[in-house]
Amino acid sequence: MSLCEAPVHVGDKELKYFQIPQMLSQLSLLASHHSRGLEFSGGQGESRILRVKVVSGIDLAKKDIFGASDPYVKLSLYVADENRELALVQTKTIKKTLNPKWNEEFYFRVNPSNHRLLFEVFDENRLTRDDFLGQVDVPLSHLPTEDPTMERPYTFKDFLLRPRSHKSRVKGFLRLKMAYMPKNGGQDEENSEQRDDMEHGWEVVDSNDSASQHQEELPPPPLPPGWEEKVDNLGRTYYVNHNNRSTQWHRPSLMDVSSESDNNIRQINQEAAHRRFRSRRHISEDLEPEASEGGGEGPEPWETISEEMNMAGDSLSLALPPPPASPVSRTSPQELSEEVSRRLQITPDSNGEQFSSLIQREPSSRLRSCSVTDTVAEQAHLPPPSTPTRRARSSTVTGGEEPTPSVAYVHTTPGLPSGWEERKDAKGRTYYVNHNNRTTTWTRPIMQLAEDGASGSATNSNNHLVEPQIRRPRSLSSPTVTLSAPLEGAKDSPIRRAVKDTLSNPQSPQPSPYNSPKPQHKVTQSFLPPGWEMRIAPNGRPFFIDHNTKTTTWEDPRLKFPVHMRSKASLNPNDLGPLPPGWEERIHLDGRTFYIDHNSKITQWEDPRLQNPAITGPAVPYSREFKQKYDYFRKKLKKPADIPNRFEMKLHRNNIFEESYRRIMSVKRPDVLKARLWIEFESEKGLDYGGVAREWFFLLSKEMFNPYYGLFEYSATDNYTLQINPNSGLCNEDHLSYFTFIGRVAGLAVFHGKLLDGFFIRPFYKMMLGKQITLNDMESVDSEYYNSLKWILENDPTELDLMFCIDEENFGQTYQVDLKPNGSEIMVTNENKREYIDLVIQWRFVNRVQKQMNAFLEGFTELLPIDLIKIFDENELELLMCGLGDVDVNDWRQHSIYKNGYCPNHPVIQWFWKAVLLMDAEKRIRLLQFVTGTSRVPMNGFAELYGSNGPQLFTIEQWGSPEKLPRAHTCFNRLDLPPYETFEDLREKLLMAVENAQGFEGVD
């Protein structure tokens, strides 16, 4: 038992597992030697002795791969205001349990007003850094005091374990007992150990604390009928709905079930499955919700520390504001529009040079697009920065936002709103200065602007957009300008040159979009972050140069977005922000809006704000080598001559898995499956020219790969990447027959040019190709296991006492598996550690699932020769089977054709692509499935879309009246689009058709 007094410091926070006991003994010894006579230096105020007893842990998260965790608790006393650590101690380690019992006591001399205690639970790992199991941050100002005169029952409190960052996976409670020692006139320290021998508990005098304890100890509500709670082999709790044969991560409640019908529940689960497989890029950064902790606890600032979120967007740190401190599940469209506006404002000059030096000198300056000439910029005199204002549609923040001092004086010209001043430039032209938000404009402000001027440009000078003058510019890179101090001092800066080039001829005649050439798809350096430049390699491949760090990369920096920006809702067309510099928006004589690029002197109908890669999606990486392999592969696939013309299946949607299994496995001659597929759904009228078959593959994929059936399970790192369940035989006695069926379905998909809707771990594809699985393949599947093996590879593992065997846990029982004959008697040394690592990888990915994989390959090779598949590598095989998950709208638009009166410049077509660009990633995938029958894109993009008669580009055909909804022909990749009269009408009915369409009634 030790008394830890401030200041006691531990220098090395990254302790190895063999250093911790030694440091702990030194810390305890130091604290006990100085327990008397040490002047308290932890802060101002009265100090008291706090007794802390770490009782136990309840239902901790499972971190070990082969069994339960080895938890211990680290206690840190720190100053709340300064975040400075004063003392650090820890408990002993309890082996192989998720409900450890420590029953260890510690004494701290604390200042209740400004000290806090941080309890961190870790899983001891002999190979790598200890795993984090959760933390509790406790303020010390409201803890009870022991009363030695009363009969004291043993009291405690269960604290909910909290995550340290948004990626932490924690669960369970930490049971603690904390109270101050009674004040006995300086005898506290001397008698503390004597009192401890006699005391067995004390009374909590805070009634609120007891009430909160009672509330937290209540058991969770019972599960609804038909639900079951289970724990997978990774220790994650999930819930099984036996009513509709589905699984989910969150705990259901009786209220949720009673409020919705079975059909609604099934639909919700299906939509969740759609998002899980389609939005691979968003779910992988899925933010784990943090449960709220009751009991009147104070704020826990440790939860806001998130290094992952800070590192996610470091390449854009100069152009973006800091990420939010806490995880965000949804963001308002206004915030998204501001983010898009900030990205659209970062534009290089004509030479591709960024003005990063200007931004670095003044990171908090606000740069807006300029709409005055260089002469006006030199002569415009601006007062000191004004008070903080709301960001308007035309504002762009470069760097972090900082509040500015209030304005000292305001010049107001009679007849103008408050804060506005009329001036003339050197050429005698009149312009107007808004001292409220430090902007200038050529347009004379009207009096209605007075009430908006001081409060912050909520409408700013964009109000003149509503004036009914067809030929006057509506917006020229936003008709306002912010002249910051660095801009005035830059004689020949890139911004000044851009301003000069933008408005060298402000009175240019209005061009007609009808006569202007169609914009060419050329390489552009627009929207690159500051300090970045794009160049073309000799082989024609673009690469990017970061002049800030003097590095080059093939990856487009514009596609690296913070985590909280990757799952956004659909954009609102009114929240897109200002136009890029040098662009102007005008209205044609027929009322349509078009855009002028004064930089390249071209006009177009497309809104340039919607061409940002952040909105359109990543470009499709064309692979010439893959194309050649695929053409060779298709050429070698021969259809037998002595088979029927087509293979027919008539199925029910609600029983598609079992019916497909019985029908396909009843075929004794696999060559029959190479005939043309003809799928019909019961009670639906649809001719299958390819579209219904794609729908069948999509629906069947969701059922085959559903972990509910026990054939597959999620990998250790996420809940969407699949791997074979090594215990599938315990879930289904006929599991090998089902794996043969799944192999046949996969072979059918590849043979007929269709795609599966599922993602497997990379070793799965390597096993199909018969390739050796390496340690690097482990990293993407199980990072913790990878780090452990990596540590063994880089260090001498002799001191770990490892043997050539592995402990495997199945349903609570632990079995020892020898990696080689008599492996339990062979020690891992520095000489044989590579053999040990290879055997562990072989056991982890191959040996446990060898029977299942052989059955899968048996069905797969019945339709496709394995030698022909081996011309692809594992990455190409994944694309061959599953396609691409992202939708590049620019590529989609470029490879589309129009019929029956539609053309690329038709207003309805312009509105259609605008609606697609304003959709979020999920809605684009659903639109793609609506028009093609699948949610996957071929390897080389939309140029290789296939229809019923071979290659068939996406087609939009004019059809019907404006009152009708759009309809799709998935067999021909065609969308019948009525000639709607407004953009809002088109967008509403397109979304209605996409979100509510199911089946093939009346549509082939």
UniProtKB/Swiss-Prot annotation:
Its EC number is 2.3.2.26, 2.3.2.36. The keyword rRNA-binding does not apply. Pathway: Protein modification; protein ubiquitination. Residues 207-230, 272-407, 453-523 are annotated as: Disordered. Phosphorylated; which impairs interaction with SCNN. Interaction with YWHAH inhibits dephosphorylation. Aldosterone induces Ser-477 phosphorylation by SGK1. GO terms for molecular function: sodium channel inhibitor activity; ubiquitin protein ligase activity. Activated by NDFIP1- and NDFIP2-binding. Gene3D superfamilies: 2.20.70.10, C2 domain, Hect, E3 ligase catalytic domain, Hect, E3 ligase catalytic domains. Highly expressed in liver and kidney. Also expressed in heart, brain and lung. Isoform 1 is expressed in kidney, lung and gut. Isoform 3 is ubiquitously expressed. Residues 30-154 form the C2 domain. Coiled coil: none annotated. The modification Phosphothreonine is found at T347, T396. The modification Phosphoserine is found at S341, S371, S475, S477, S478, S493, S504, S508, S512, S516. Residues 221-254, 414-447, 526-559, 577-610 form the WW domain. It catalyses: S-ubiquitinyl-[E2 ubiquitin-conjugating enzyme]-L-cysteine + [acceptor protein]-L-lysine = [E2 ubiquitin-conjugating enzyme]-L-cysteine + N(6)-ubiquitinyl-[acceptor protein]-L-lysine; [E2 ubiquitin-conjugating enzyme]-S-ubiquitinyl-L-cysteine + [acceptor protein]-L-cysteine = [E2 ubiquitin-conjugating enzyme]-L-cysteine + [acceptor protein]-S-ubiquitinyl-L-cysteine. Residues 489-500 have a biased composition (Basic and acidic residues). Residues 669-1003 form the HECT domain. Pfam families: C2 (PF00168), HECT (PF00632), WW (PF00397). GO terms for biological process: cell differentiation; establishment of localization in cell; negative regulation of sodium ion transport; negative regulation of systemic arterial blood pressure; positive regulation of sodium ion transport; protein ubiquitination; regulation of bicellular tight junction assembly; regulation of postsynaptic neurotransmitter receptor internalization. InterPro entries: C2_dom, C2_domain_sf, E3_ub_ligase_SMURF1, E3_ubiq-protein_ligase, HECT_dom, Hect_E3_ubiquitin_ligase, WW_dom, WW_dom_sf. Keywords: Cytoplasm, Differentiation, Endosome, Golgi apparatus, Phosphoprotein, Repeat, Transferase, Ubl conjugation, Ubl conjugation pathway. Residues 347-359, 366-376 have a biased composition (Polar residues). WW domains are involved in recognizing PPxY motifs in substrate proteins. Interacts with UBE2E3. Interacts with NDFIP1; this interaction activates the E3 ubiquitin-protein ligase. Interacts with NDFIP2; this interaction activates the E3 ubiquitin-protein ligase. Interacts (via WW domains) with SCN1A. Interacts (via WW domains) with SCN2A. Interacts (via WW domains) with SCN3A. Interacts (via WW domains) with SCN5A. Interacts (via WW domains) with SCN8A. Interacts (via WW domains) with SCN9A. Interacts (via WW domains) with SCN10A. Interacts (via WW domains) with CLCN5. Interacts with SMAD2. Interacts with SMAD3. Interacts with SMAD6. Interacts with SMAD7. E3 ubiquitin-protein ligase that mediates the polyubiquitination of lysine and cysteine residues on target proteins and is thereby implicated in the regulation of various signaling pathways including autophagy, innate immunity or DNA repair. Inhibits TGF-beta signaling by triggering SMAD2 and TGFBR1 ubiquitination and proteasome-dependent degradation. Downregulates autophagy and cell growth by ubiquitinating and reducing cellular ULK1 or ASCT2 levels. This is E3 ubiquitin-protein ligase NEDD4-like. It comes from Mus musculus. The lineage of its organism: Eukaryota, Metazoa, Chordata, Craniata, Vertebrata.
